[in-house]
Design a protein with these regions (language model features):
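Two-component/phosphorelay signaling modules centered on CheY-like receiver
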Residues: 16-35
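Acidic, metal-coordinating helix/loop segments flanking the phosphotransfer/catalytic sites
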Residues: 36-54
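Conserved phosphotransfer microenvironments
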Residues: 57-75
Length: 126
């Protein structure tokens, strides 16, 4: 599976095991993983320094943070993202409306499909 060959994917996930699994899934799909990072500050710095092509965000991060500021910056810059979360869809804030929602747990194929959908929808907007 090399659907994402060469695509730079920012991973924002604070759980080490989930981040490691996500990294593995993305590499197997051909992506170049940026991160993973588990804090908003680190994600914003990576976006500012070298913008990724797309991102995968967990909603709830450590220390009471959410990835909403990251989603806002990505949206402002026209960078598509997938929100991979276990949070019920009805309780996801509007800051994530431009992303593709992927409910945990998910299969690798579903992750790749969500990333492809996010890239296609962003391409249709631009």
């Amino acid at each position: 599976m090399s659907v994402l060959r060469g695509v730079r994917v920012l991973v924002v996930e604070n759980d080490d095991m989930n981040a490691m699994l996500l990294d593995l899934q993305l590499v197997q799909a051909g992506a170049v993983v940026v991160g993973p990072v588990g804090e908003v500050r680190d994600a914003l710095q990576l976006i500012a320094a070298d913008a990724p092509d797309i991102a995968v965000l967990d909603y709830r991060l450590g220390n009471g943070e959410t990835s909403e500021p990251v989603a806002r910056l990505l949206s402002e810059r026209g960078i598509p993202f997938v929100l991979a979360t276990g949070v019920a869809i009805g309780s996801i804030p509007s800051g994530f409306e431009r992303g593709v929602i992927l409910i945990k747990p998910y299969l690798s194929e579903e992750l790749v499909g969500a990333l492809s959908k996010a890239r296609e929808s962003r391409g249709a907007e631009g």
